[in-house]
Swiss-Prot record:
Pfam families according to UniProt: PALP (PF00291)
Keyword Hydrolase: yes
Protein name (record): 1-aminocyclopropane-1-carboxylate deaminase
Keyword field contains Hydrolase: yes
Reactions listed under catalytic activity: 1-aminocyclopropane-1-carboxylate + H2O = 2-oxobutanoate + NH4(+)
Family note: Belongs to the ACC deaminase/D-cysteine desulfhydrase family.
Gene behind the chain: acdS
Lineage: superkingdom: Bacteria
EC identifiers of the protein: 3.5.99.7
A molecular function (GO) term: 1-aminocyclopropane-1-carboxylate deaminase activity
Active-site residues, Swiss-Prot/TrEMBL: S78 (nucleophile)
Organism: Ralstonia nicotianae (strain ATCC BAA-1114 / GMI1000) (Ralstonia solanacearum)
């Protein structure tokens, strides 16, 4: 496998820390050792997160091509758009963000706090759009790029989650290589890796990266899209394309993609009672915050799997914390009593 042939522009502090979740592990019976790799602490750029790791492989193309405006898209509380806005500010570029109405959640301040508030502070041109949630290329995003061209700018397209960009999976191939280096220091290997999946490129990169040592199917995706067939198709397609880019040396198959579809409901961006319980439990056992859209759902999935005995006794499970905590502010009503 050859990831190093692809240029990378550092936006992160370096390897993200792995911490044992000792109290949570004990609370759940002590038969499975839980750890977290803190992608939520990976950068000083507006709280960072998993998209910042991905953007490291897109920025060289931005700089080499003379682009002056980053154009991205997400929901109103998108972590992706906040991270794109931060990277644009860091590089001295303009930024246009399309924020679609992906979540059926009514709150008076939903479009004024959290991620979207930070994007505005960072100087992005934030454009609200009424379109609902879907996965793939969006007309509103294409229109935003055309608007930049008409104004004389040169837009660089960054799709939702970086996932439709050809290089969108590379960052999390690097995640897997980083984990292997940390495992060598620890003196053990993780048996499973748990990660939230929606647009697909985070899990796809992990699948490719861990395929290099035979653990592709030990990457357990927890769907948070509530459109799991679309998400599964994206993961598989992106993983296959990424495997070619890094010269993995073998094909990625359907069996390599494991996606647990039990925790994404009731729909994208809306937590269920299990999500909220997982957020509170993780916070109160470990002081580690997760959000109602993504990490709360993947945390719910991991906790439920431990409780149900789905991880063999003695397993070491690595939870990939992808970030997203700023979105908690947009759901304050749900936590008004803690």
């Amino acid at each position: 496998m050859n990831l190093n042939k692809h240029p990378r522009h550092p936006l992160t502090f370096g390897p993200t820390p792995i911490q044992p979740l000792k109290r949570l592990s004990a609370h759940l019976g002590g038969k499975v050792e839980l750890y977290a790799k803190r992608e939520d602490c990976n950068s000083g750029l507006a709280f960072g997160g998993n998209k910042t790791r991905k953007l490291e492989y897109l920025v060289p193309e931005v700089l080499a091509g003379g682009y002056d405006t980053l154009v991205s898209i997400g929901g109103i509380q998108s972590n992706q758009t906040r991270q794109v806005a931060a990277v644009a500010a860091h590089l001295g570029l303009k930024c246009v963000l399309v924020q679609e109405n992906w979540v059926n959640y009514a709150d008076a301040v939903y479009d004024r706090v959290g991620n979207i508030e930070l994007s505005r502070i960072l100087g992005a041109d934030v454009r609200l759009d009424a379109a609902g949630f879907d996965i793939g290329i969006r007309p509103s995003w294409e229109q935003a790029m055309e608007d930049v061209r008409r104004a004389g700018g040169k837009p660089f397209p960054i799709p939702a989650g970086c996932s439709e960009h050809p290089l969108g999976g590379l960052g999390f191939v690097g995640f897997a290589e980083e984990v292997r280096q940390q495992e060598a220091e620890f003196g053990f290997r993780f048996d499973y890796i748990v990660v939230c999946s929606v647009t697909g490129s985070t899990q796809a990169g992990m699948v490719v990266g861990f395929a290099a040592d035979g653990r592709a199917d030990r990457v357990i995706g927890i769907d948070a899209s509530a459109k799991p067939e679309q998400t599964r198709e994206q993961i598989l397609r992106i993983a296959r394309d990424t495997a070619k880019l890094v010269e993995l040396g073998r094909d990625i198959t359907e069996d390599d993609v494991v996606l647990d579809t039990r925790y994404g409901g009731p729909e994208y961006g809306l937590p269920n009672e299990g999500t909220l319980e997982a957020i509170r439990l993780c916070a109160r056992q470990e002081g580690m915050l997760t959000d109602p859209v993504y990490e709360g759902k993947s945390m719910h999935g991991m906790i439920d799997r431990v409780r149900g005995g789905e991880f063999p006794e003695g397993s070491r499970v690595l939870y990939a914390h992808l970030g997203g905590v700023p979105a908690l502010n947009a759901y304050s009503f749900l936590f008004r009593n803690g």
